[in-house]
């Protein structure tokens, strides 16, 4: 894109053949349906371990990298994140912002790696507190449990 060089990363998990375009020097990554604001894509034919590896790879990017996501499911994702981590003040603040943006009809599909590390339960699946909350000892199993909980979530 212009003078910006992108690396193409294979990021399976959401769907076979899913790719992300990463320009770390430009602090930009087009992540499609792997990461959403406070969420992640469903698993359509791929596996939870594949998705966990893809999310974990994206999480290695610097915190100030802007993520361009594929959809705006932020309001629903925020309700789920708040239900999973009711004591997380960063999630509560961001969930309130999601409600305001949804009420105003504002599309929200840009975020940063740092914001997602603080407020996205799927990127937090490997943290000891999250694994303990979910009764899991393995980050991949913790992610799989969260993904199933989100699939079943009606909040």
Question: What are these model-derived regions, one by one?
Answer:
Residues 1-85, 144-147, 153:
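Catalytic core of the metallo-beta-lactamase
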Residues 53-66, 75-155:
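Accessory terminal helices/loops
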């Amino acid at each position: 894109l212009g003078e910006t060089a992108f690396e193409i990363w294979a990021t399976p998990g959401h769907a076979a053949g899913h790719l992300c375009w990463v320009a770390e020097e430009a602090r930009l990554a087009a992540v499609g349906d792997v990461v959403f604001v406070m969420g992640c894509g469903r698993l359509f034919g791929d596996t939870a371990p594949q998705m966990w590896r893809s999310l974990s790879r994206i999480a290695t990017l610097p915190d100030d990298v802007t993520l361009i996501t594929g959809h705006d499911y932020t309001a629903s994702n925020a309700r789920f994140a708040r239900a999973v981590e009711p004591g997380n003040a960063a999630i509560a603040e961001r969930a309130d912002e999601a409600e305001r943006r949804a009420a105003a009809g504002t599309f929200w599909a840009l975020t940063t790696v740092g914001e997602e590390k603080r407020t996205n339960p799927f990127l937090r699946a490997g943290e000891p507190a999250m694994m303990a909350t979910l009764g899991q000892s393995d980050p991949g199993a913790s992610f799989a449990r969260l993904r199933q909980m989100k699939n079943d979530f009606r909040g």
